[in-house]
Amino acid sequence: MRLTDFSFELPESLIAHYPQAQRSACRLLSLDGPTGDLTHGTFTDLLDKLNPGDLLVFNNTRVIPARLFGRKASGGKIEVLVERMLDDHRVLAHIRASKAPKPGAELLLGDDESVNATMTARHDALFEVQFNDARPVLDILNSIGHMPLPPYIERPDEEADRELYQTVYSQKPGAVAAPTAGLHFDEPLLERLRAKGIEMAFVTLHVGAGTFQPVRVESIEDHVMHSEYAEVPQEVVDAVLAAKARGNKVVAVGTTSVRSLESAAQAAQDALIAPFFGDTQIFIYPGYQYKVIDALVTNFHLPESTLIMLVSAFAGYKHTMNAYREAVKAEYRFFSYGDAMYITYNPQAINERPGE
């Protein structure tokens, strides 16, 4: 499959730079996987699409203020984007500088350059950084870090983003990008879902900066996925199996929940799904056999991204690309702070490839 198969025209004006004033007030485009039928509505319509006993699976990762500005002690300006916290004093990070720091280089971080750190080693594209500070890394980031807004949101981060670029149920710090489908759930909507008898379970996948890396190969089968840490605990496995046994739907909130659940299914030897704690590089594109998920809540993704490939594998290539063309025509808002889709599984999607 060619990368260009997943391209579509997107006017700049449809990229959302700020979220809706009310989380659950965004628009919702519903795609019926088997037929391709589209329905336009608002996000709270989700209440009517779910039945008592259906299971929503959320990603409870919490975005850390992972972007740091500063300079090398030798002079040059740097920008550090923390990819992963290794322990209380060490991180793996991307570093932007006119000249990459060498091992042993001293870094002065923070707008006032008050935090001292050392670049200790390089691991391919990532740099290992040791903070020379008594405080734990997370405290330092909360103190001097900036929220790592996606590259297509072309504005500096604001204080409000610390709350807005975060799901209301986020718990475990470690992501450098929000699991954005979850941004549309506010407490009143969660309360109404619970009142209807909708079950909820929480996986953790710490979204890495790699989620914004463009696919750089023409043939998508050659793409190597970035690695992210995921946790699917026993209680999630139990909830999934119980929902399936009842004949209810398992609904993933966001592509990160999809990737967590499907990683846990791939790792299960003879069961449908088993607990999973570890790094995943799962790459889902047309031809992939979904094992766990019956429906998906997700935002609108970038052209030629691995995420539009994941959706195509779920709903079918033609239905997906048609839905995106319709969304552009109807002026839905795209990407992280944009509108949402609700998609049901198309069992025929596995047999469909672009160009067929």
Swiss-Prot record:
Coiled-coil residue windows: none
Gene3D superfamilies, per database record: QueA-like
GO molecular function terms listed in the Swiss-Prot or TrEMBL record: S-adenosylmethionine:tRNA ribosyltransferase-isomerase activity
Compartments (UniProt record): Cytoplasm
Enzyme class per UniProt: transferase
Keywords: Cytoplasm, Queuosine biosynthesis, S-adenosyl-L-methionine, Transferase
GO cellular component terms, semicolon-separated: cytoplasm
The keyword S-adenosyl-L-methionine is assigned to this record: yes
Catalytic function, reaction form: 7-aminomethyl-7-carbaguanosine(34) in tRNA + S-adenosyl-L-methionine = epoxyqueuosine(34) in tRNA + adenine + L-methionine + 2 H(+)
Pathway terms, separated by semicolons: tRNA modification; tRNA-queuosine biosynthesis
One Pfam family it belongs to: Queuosine_synth
Gene Ontology biological process terms, A to Z: queuosine biosynthetic process; tRNA wobble guanine modification
Keyword S-adenosyl-L-methionine among record annotations: yes
EC number: 2.4.99.17
Chief location: cytoplasm
Subunit structure: Monomer.
Family membership: Belongs to the QueA family.
Known role: Transfers and isomerizes the ribose moiety from AdoMet to the 7-aminomethyl group of 7-deazaguanine (preQ1-tRNA) to give epoxyqueuosine (oQ-tRNA).
Protein name as it appears in the record: S-adenosylmethionine:tRNA ribosyltransferase-isomerase
Organism: Cronobacter sakazakii (strain ATCC BAA-894)
Gene that this sequence comes from: queA
